[in-house]
């Protein structure tokens, strides 16, 4: 078994929201999306600048799509990049970010949107009262272990939940996110999952479609905007259909014109 040495205590640093994606806002904020970058299972190293930068294109796309409703997007800066076992540091930082967003903007709906281990953090921190929606992209979820408690799902009750996973992801197992979605669907019917055929962990091959789906989901969840038929069908379909919904090539292209 590999052993990991933490470099400096995560608690010596503080998580941060920083400036909103797209610059300072001049209009009223009607909702917030908190973007949670990928991380590492065990590490005390400073949060990755590369992982932070990887969330910016999605943040910009969501901010543009939700500008008329006053959507603010922030990429959360973790104390450190590691989940770190039962400490679940990334989830703790995500919970802090929700509290900070409410302090900063008032009583507005919040969506947690994470990638990789940030996806796990988004799902875990969903129990915060202000959270109305959770988007988990290629989420890193643990293997089933009879000696450990399964990844919790009760905190998702009352939230709208979307998981998106590439079928060729070599870093995080898409089958584990499917199993998680199965359990989550039993606790919370407003759960669905899309599969991106032949795409990998970074979801680069169909990035435009993934961003369009994310915008549809976030704006529909936070502001009750009408959403595309595939998303409606996925939410309504029983397992496994609504948990293995294929993301069609060109999804959202008509809206992008």
Where are these regions (language model features)?
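Short beta-strand/loop motif that positions the catalytic acidic residue
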Residues: 156-157, 162-169
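Acidic catalytic loop of the alpha/beta-hydrolase fold
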Residues: 142-143, 166-173
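Short alpha-helix in the alpha/beta-hydrolase fold that links the catalytic acid
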Residues: 149, 173-183
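C-terminal catalytic histidine-bearing segment of alpha/beta-hydrolase fold enzymes
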Residues: 189-257
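Gly/Ala-rich beta-loop-alpha elbow adjacent to hydrolase catalytic centers
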Residues: 113-122
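A conserved short beta-strand
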Residues: 130-142
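Short, surface-exposed "cap/lid" segments of acyl-processing enzymes
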Residues: 2-68
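Alpha/beta-hydrolase active-site loop
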Residues: 84-104
């Amino acid at each position: 078994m590999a052993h990991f040495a933490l470099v400096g205590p995560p608690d010596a640093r503080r998580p941060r929201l920083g400036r909103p994606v797209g610059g300072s806002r001049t209009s009223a904020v009607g909702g917030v999306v908190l973007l949670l970058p990928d991380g590492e299972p065990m590490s005390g190293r400073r949060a990755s600048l590369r992982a932070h930068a990887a969330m910016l294109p999605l943040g910009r796309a969501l901010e543009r799509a939700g500008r008329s409703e006053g959507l603010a997007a922030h990429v959360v800066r973790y104390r450190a990049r590691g989940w770190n076992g039962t400490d679940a540091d990334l989830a703790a930082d995500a919970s802090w970010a929700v509290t900070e967003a409410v302090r900063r903007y008032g009583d507005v709906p919040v969506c947690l949107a994470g990638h990789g281990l940030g996806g796990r953090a988004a799902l875990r921190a969903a129990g915060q009262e202000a959270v109305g929606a959770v988007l988990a992209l290629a989420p890193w979820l643990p293997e089933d272990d009879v000696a450990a408690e399964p990844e919790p799902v009760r905190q998702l009750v009352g939230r709208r939940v979307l998981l998106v996973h590439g079928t060729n992801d070599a870093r995080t197992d898409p089958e584990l996110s499917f199993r998680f979605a199965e359990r989550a669907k039993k606790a919370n019917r407003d759960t669905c999952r899309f599969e991106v055929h032949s795409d990998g962990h970074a979801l680069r091959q169909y990035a435009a479609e993934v961003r369009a789906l994310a915008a549809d989901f976030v704006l529909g969840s936070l502001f009750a905007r009408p959403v595309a038929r595939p998303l409606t069908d996925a939410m309504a379909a029983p397992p496994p259909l609504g948990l293995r919904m294929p993301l069609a090539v060109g999804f959202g292209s008509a809206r992008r014109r």
